[in-house]
Amino acid sequence: MKLFGVSGDRDKFRKLTSHPQQVLGCELFESLDGDMRGQRMLRIRNGEIEIEVLVDRGFDIGRVLYQGIPTQWVSPAGFRHAHTFTPSAIEPDGWGWLRTWQGGFLSTIGIDHVGGPKSTPNRHLHPGITAERRFTGGFISLSPTTIEKVDVNWEKGTIEVIAKVRQAAAFAEHLVLTRKISMNFGESTFKLSDFIQ
């Protein structure tokens, strides 16, 4: 493999670095200021590629840097914590999601509604609710995440993170998205898989 202009295997790179985290690692951190205040993020580093996972935004992928170059688009709203979103207070017509949509490398849409705002017949189990208004984008990217696994294995040269995102409401849906992101040392790619229950 070739990394930062140097050819070699994992053992060679181990000798060239004082700590494996220089080229292979994963850190959980939290933003302390501005619109992102309180947002937890995972920064995953694998040689020449680095990704930033927005833990409290449905485990979406915010930034992806390849050789230090950003590959994502960021909306004019910028990166924001989901708690800044109040759809009924900001945009009563259902488009308020766009005020907090950060763009990024991957924004999860749905998982039970995609497209623009609309009203649907009741699917709640509560007799007092006769219709439901769905807003643009759905709820999942506004949902916090439970991190199930973070495994950085220098011996195998792998990184794997698994998280669960739950979208639920009383008398309504209870959906769980399990997202896995994995990388192999020295490869400039990552794999993402989703499973919905």
Regions found by a protein language model. Give the residues of each.
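A conserved active-site cap/scaffold subdomain adjacent to cofactor or substrate pockets
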Residues: S193-Q197
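Surface-exposed acidic/polar loop and edge beta-strand patches at domain peripheries
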Residues: M1-K191
